[in-house]
């Protein structure tokens, strides 16, 4: 159960005080919580029918795919246009590019990325394992999301 915090003067620091809430008690007192989040906190399989899961996954996947497509087009246009303008300016003599320095900087960046990737490998493996577990537990909504995402990219 949640208990109220003592008055602020009992703390060493008067800056902030926090209250710990017990969500199970909160859900019992607020019935809308149960309507929105359901009675169980398990996988989606326990809460909704297969058709509902497929529709939910498909709609969210389509939205994500559509946005990914639009943002991707915009980013590709900006990068491609910038590169094209840089090439025209270089060819016209407005800009001088030191390609040896560019190559040196790119190689330095590659080495730094490899170092950081090797350090981050355990955390990435953790995230991948959690994502895999989620997908296995919610295979229907996950497959709906993937299908919707691909449809969103295509539209």
Curated annotation (Swiss-Prot):
The modification Phosphotyrosine is found at residue 18. There is a cross-link at residue 119 (Glycyl lysine isopeptide (Lys-Gly) (interchain with G-Cter in ubiquitin)). The chain crosses the membrane at residues 48-68, 75-95, 134-154. This is FUN14 domain-containing protein 1. Its main location: mitochondrion. GO terms for biological process: autophagy of mitochondrion; mitochondrial fusion; mitophagy; response to hypoxia. Disruption phenotype: Deletion mutant mice challenged with CCl4 show a higher survival rate than WT mice.
């Amino acid at each position: 159960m949640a208990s109220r915090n003592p008055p602020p003067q009992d703390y060493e620091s008067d800056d902030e005080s926090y209250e710990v809430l017990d969500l199970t008690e909160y859900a019992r007192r607020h019935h809308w919580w149960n309507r929105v989040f359901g009675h169980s906190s398990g996988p989606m399989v326990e809460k909704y029918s297969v058709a509902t899961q497929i529709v939910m996954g498909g709609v969210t996947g389509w939205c994500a795919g559509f946005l990914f497509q639009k943002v991707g087009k915009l980013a590709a246009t900006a990068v491609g246009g910038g590169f094209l303008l840089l090439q025209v300016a270089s060819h016209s003599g407005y800009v001088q590019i030191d390609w040896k320095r560019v190559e040196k900087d790119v190689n330095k960046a590659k080495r730094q990325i490899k170092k950081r990737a090797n350090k981050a490998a355990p955390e990435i493996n953790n995230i991948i394992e959690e994502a895999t577990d989620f997908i296995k537990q919610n295979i229907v909504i996950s497959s709906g999301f993937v299908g919707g995402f691909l449809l969103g990219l295509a539209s």
